[in-house]
Protein backbone atom coordinates (compact mmCIF):
# COMPACT_ATOMS: atom_id res chain seq x y z
CA UNK A 1 0.00 0.00 0.00
CA UNK A 2 2.77 2.47 0.94
CA UNK A 3 6.02 2.24 -1.04
CA UNK A 4 7.95 4.65 1.16
CA UNK A 5 7.41 7.26 3.84
CA UNK A 6 9.52 10.41 3.91
CA UNK A 7 9.58 12.45 7.08
CA UNK A 8 11.34 13.26 10.33
CA UNK A 9 12.57 10.56 12.68
CA UNK A 10 10.96 11.42 16.02
CA UNK A 11 11.54 8.28 18.10
CA UNK A 12 13.73 5.16 18.17
CA UNK A 13 12.86 2.14 20.31
CA UNK A 14 14.13 -1.44 20.56
CA UNK A 15 12.37 -2.78 17.47
CA UNK A 16 10.55 0.16 15.89
CA UNK A 17 10.91 3.79 14.93
CA UNK A 18 8.36 6.59 14.67
CA UNK A 19 8.46 8.82 11.59
CA UNK A 20 6.45 12.06 11.43
CA UNK A 21 5.24 12.66 7.88
CA UNK A 22 3.11 15.81 7.58
CA UNK A 23 1.81 15.62 11.12
CA UNK A 24 1.10 11.87 11.14
CA UNK A 25 3.36 9.67 13.27
CA UNK A 26 3.96 6.25 11.70
CA UNK A 27 5.11 3.42 13.98
CA UNK A 28 7.39 1.32 11.76
CA UNK A 29 8.95 -1.99 12.81
CA UNK A 30 12.48 -2.24 11.49
CA UNK A 31 15.65 -4.33 11.59
CA UNK A 32 18.65 -3.37 13.69
CA UNK A 33 20.58 -2.51 10.51
CA UNK A 34 17.90 -0.05 9.38
CA UNK A 35 17.61 1.30 12.92
CA UNK A 36 21.34 2.11 12.88
CA UNK A 37 21.18 3.56 9.34
CA UNK A 38 18.21 5.77 10.25
CA UNK A 39 20.51 8.16 12.08
CA UNK A 40 19.64 10.49 14.93
CA UNK A 41 16.22 11.62 16.12
CA UNK A 42 15.24 14.83 14.33
CA UNK A 43 16.84 13.79 11.04
CA UNK A 44 14.87 13.67 7.76
CA UNK A 45 14.69 10.09 6.45
CA UNK A 46 13.08 7.96 3.77
CA UNK A 47 11.83 4.53 4.84
CA UNK A 48 10.78 1.90 2.26
CA UNK A 49 7.74 0.20 3.73
CA UNK A 50 5.61 -2.92 3.69
CA UNK A 51 2.13 -3.00 5.24
CA UNK A 52 1.33 -6.40 6.75
CA UNK A 53 -2.41 -6.94 7.25
CA UNK A 54 -3.88 -9.65 9.47
CA UNK A 55 -7.43 -10.14 10.71
CA UNK A 56 -7.07 -7.84 13.70
CA UNK A 57 -3.82 -5.90 13.16
CA UNK A 58 -2.04 -3.83 10.52
CA UNK A 59 1.72 -3.57 11.05
CA UNK A 60 4.06 -1.34 9.08
CA UNK A 61 7.60 -2.61 8.43
CA UNK A 62 10.30 -0.33 7.07
CA UNK A 63 13.84 -0.32 5.75
CA UNK A 64 16.42 2.35 4.96
CA UNK A 65 17.50 0.61 1.73
CA UNK A 66 15.48 -0.89 -1.08
CA UNK A 67 17.81 -3.93 -1.05
CA UNK A 68 16.84 -4.72 2.53
CA UNK A 69 13.15 -4.33 1.70
CA UNK A 70 13.52 -6.66 -1.30
CA UNK A 71 15.25 -9.26 0.87
CA UNK A 72 12.47 -8.91 3.47
CA UNK A 73 9.87 -9.55 0.75
CA UNK A 74 11.79 -12.65 -0.36
CA UNK A 75 11.93 -13.91 3.23
CA UNK A 76 8.23 -13.52 3.97
CA UNK A 77 7.46 -15.45 0.78
CA UNK A 78 8.99 -18.52 2.47
CA UNK A 79 6.46 -20.88 4.04
CA UNK A 80 6.46 -20.44 7.83
CA UNK A 81 8.50 -17.21 7.87
CA UNK A 82 6.52 -14.23 9.10
CA UNK A 83 7.50 -10.56 9.16
CA UNK A 84 8.95 -10.72 12.69
CA UNK A 85 11.19 -13.72 11.82
CA UNK A 86 12.27 -11.97 8.62
CA UNK A 87 13.21 -8.85 10.62
CA UNK A 88 15.12 -11.02 13.05
CA UNK A 89 17.16 -12.51 10.20
CA UNK A 90 17.82 -9.09 8.65
CA UNK A 91 18.92 -7.78 12.06
CA UNK A 92 21.87 -10.20 12.22
CA UNK A 93 23.08 -9.93 8.63
CA UNK A 94 23.11 -7.59 5.65
CA UNK A 95 21.19 -8.41 2.47
CA UNK A 96 24.47 -9.17 0.66
CA UNK A 97 25.70 -11.53 3.38
CA UNK A 98 22.27 -13.15 3.56
CA UNK A 99 22.28 -13.80 -0.21
CA UNK A 100 25.73 -15.37 0.09
CA UNK A 101 24.52 -17.51 3.02
CA UNK A 102 21.58 -18.79 0.97
CA UNK A 103 23.65 -19.53 -2.11
CA UNK A 104 26.38 -21.28 -0.10
CA UNK A 105 23.92 -23.22 2.14
CA UNK A 106 25.23 -21.47 5.27
CA UNK A 107 22.64 -22.51 7.88
CA UNK A 108 24.84 -21.19 10.71
CA UNK A 109 24.59 -17.56 9.58
CA UNK A 110 20.79 -17.70 9.34
CA UNK A 111 20.32 -19.44 12.70
CA UNK A 112 22.08 -16.54 14.46
CA UNK A 113 18.71 -14.77 14.26
CA UNK A 114 16.51 -14.97 17.34
CA UNK A 115 13.71 -17.51 16.90
CA UNK A 116 15.21 -19.10 13.77
CA UNK A 117 16.22 -22.73 14.19
CA UNK A 118 18.02 -25.10 11.82
CA UNK A 119 14.78 -26.37 10.24
CA UNK A 120 13.54 -22.87 9.39
CA UNK A 121 17.00 -21.90 8.11
CA UNK A 122 17.08 -24.95 5.84
CA UNK A 123 13.58 -24.13 4.55
CA UNK A 124 14.67 -20.54 3.83
CA UNK A 125 17.71 -21.79 1.91
CA UNK A 126 15.71 -24.40 0.03
CA UNK A 127 12.94 -22.02 -1.04
CA UNK A 128 15.08 -18.96 -1.79
CA UNK A 129 18.06 -20.59 -3.48
CA UNK A 130 16.07 -21.36 -6.63
CA UNK A 131 14.48 -17.90 -6.64
CA UNK A 132 17.89 -16.30 -6.37
CA UNK A 133 19.22 -18.38 -9.25
CA UNK A 134 16.35 -17.64 -11.63
CA UNK A 135 15.02 -14.28 -10.48
CA UNK A 136 14.98 -12.16 -13.67
CA UNK A 137 18.42 -13.45 -14.64
CA UNK A 138 18.97 -12.94 -18.35
CA UNK A 139 22.45 -13.91 -19.45
CA UNK A 140 23.15 -13.48 -23.14
CA UNK A 141 25.72 -16.21 -23.73
CA UNK A 142 25.94 -15.40 -27.45
CA UNK A 143 27.62 -12.09 -26.63
CA UNK A 144 29.86 -13.87 -24.13
CA UNK A 145 31.05 -16.67 -26.45
CA UNK A 146 34.70 -16.15 -25.48
CA UNK A 147 33.89 -15.92 -21.79
CA UNK A 148 31.40 -18.66 -20.80
CA UNK A 149 30.24 -18.01 -17.24
CA UNK A 150 31.21 -20.55 -14.59
CA UNK A 151 28.57 -21.87 -12.20
CA UNK A 152 30.08 -19.77 -9.39
CA UNK A 153 29.90 -16.59 -11.43
CA UNK A 154 26.33 -17.40 -12.49
CA UNK A 155 25.34 -17.82 -8.84
CA UNK A 156 27.12 -14.58 -7.95
CA UNK A 157 25.20 -12.78 -10.70
CA UNK A 158 21.96 -14.24 -9.36
CA UNK A 159 22.78 -12.95 -5.87
CA UNK A 160 23.54 -9.48 -7.22
CA UNK A 161 20.23 -9.44 -9.12
CA UNK A 162 18.43 -10.31 -5.87
CA UNK A 163 20.24 -7.40 -4.21
CA UNK A 164 18.76 -5.01 -6.75
CA UNK A 165 21.32 -4.97 -9.57
CA UNK A 166 19.97 -5.20 -13.12
CA UNK A 167 21.11 -8.38 -14.85
CA UNK A 168 23.37 -6.33 -17.16
CA UNK A 169 24.99 -4.47 -14.24
CA UNK A 170 25.48 -7.74 -12.35
CA UNK A 171 27.13 -9.33 -15.39
CA UNK A 172 29.44 -6.32 -15.81
CA UNK A 173 30.38 -6.39 -12.10
CA UNK A 174 31.32 -10.09 -12.30
CA UNK A 175 32.82 -10.12 -15.81
CA UNK A 176 36.49 -9.57 -14.93
CA UNK A 177 36.49 -11.72 -11.78
CA UNK A 178 38.13 -15.16 -11.80
CA UNK A 179 35.41 -17.82 -12.13
CA UNK A 180 37.40 -20.33 -10.08
CA UNK A 181 36.89 -18.29 -6.90
CA UNK A 182 34.10 -19.26 -4.48
CA UNK A 183 30.69 -17.64 -4.94
CA UNK A 184 31.19 -15.65 -1.73
CA UNK A 185 34.57 -14.29 -2.91
CA UNK A 186 33.16 -13.35 -6.32
CA UNK A 187 30.26 -11.46 -4.70
CA UNK A 188 32.60 -9.64 -2.30
CA UNK A 189 34.85 -8.54 -5.18
CA UNK A 190 31.86 -7.45 -7.27
CA UNK A 191 30.39 -5.40 -4.39
CA UNK A 192 33.80 -3.85 -3.70
CA UNK A 193 33.76 -2.54 -7.24
Predicted regions and their residues:
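Structure-specific DNA junction-binding interface
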Residues: 1-77, 183-187, 191-193
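Signal for well-folded cores of large energy- and translation-related assemblies
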Residues: 10, 50, 76, 91-94, ...
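Amphipathic, charged-and-aliphatic alpha-helical interface segments
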Residues: 51, 58-59, 83-102, 123-134
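Small-residue helix-packing motif on alpha-helices
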Residues: 86, 98, 121, 170-173, ...
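Anionic-ligand binding region
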Residues: 103-115, 124
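Strongly charged, low-complexity linkers/loops
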Residues: 124-174
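Glycine-rich, often acidic, oxyanion-interacting loops/wings at catalytic, nucleic-acid
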Residues: 141-152, 180, 185-193
Amino acid sequence: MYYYIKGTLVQKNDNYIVVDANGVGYMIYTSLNSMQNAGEVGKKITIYTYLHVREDVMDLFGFTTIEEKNMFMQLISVSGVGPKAALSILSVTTPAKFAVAVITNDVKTITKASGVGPKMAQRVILELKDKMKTDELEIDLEDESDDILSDNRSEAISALVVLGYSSNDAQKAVKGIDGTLSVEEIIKKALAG
